[in-house]
């Protein structure tokens, strides 16, 4: 994990990125950044203790509903992107599609529907680049 930390730290420094914790303080900071009109990137494939249960590669797993909830409450767009490691070892970040939350009413059904779109996108990208994705945790843990 040492080299991963170095990459993260270099990206933070180069692009003035702020990483927030998955706790109440981090959530409060995230909402403040959001209200201030800042762009927000969420790494929504992290292991969660809470969330909604969805199918991912044919198995049930917990998935964060935060991207869908934020988008529905604000009417903002969700851009689905993926970092691709190139042959020279550098990464290129590609954005493939967007979800226009303003097309949906703010309901729990639509939180699930948007979350399913996001997770289907993850599945498609992992299938396309399986050698570039690795979980460091038990992804299908439901408790």
Model-derived features: positions:
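Short acidic-hydrophobic, aromatic-tinged amphipathic segments that line or gate anion-handling sites
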Residues: 18-22
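Membrane-proximal helix-turn-helix segments that form the acceptor-binding/catalytic region
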Residues: 8, 12-16
């Amino acid at each position: 994990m040492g080299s991963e930390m170095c990459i993260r730290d270099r990206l933070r420094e180069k692009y003035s990125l702020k990483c927030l914790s998955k706790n109440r303080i981090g959530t409060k900071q995230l909402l403040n950044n959001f209200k201030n009109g800042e762009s927000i990137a969420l790494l929504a494939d992290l292991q969660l203790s809470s969330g909604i249960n969805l199918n991912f590669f044919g198995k049930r797993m917990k998935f964060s509903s935060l991207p869908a909830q934020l988008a529905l409450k604000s009417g903002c767009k969700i851009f689905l992107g993926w970092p691709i490691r190139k042959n020279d070892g550098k990464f290129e970040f590609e954005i493939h599609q967007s979800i226009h939350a303003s097309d949906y009413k703010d309901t729990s059904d639509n939180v699930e529907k948007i979350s399913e779109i996001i997770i289907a996108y993850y599945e498609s990208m992992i299938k396309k680049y399986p050698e570039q994705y690795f979980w460091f945790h038990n992804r299908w843990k439901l408790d």
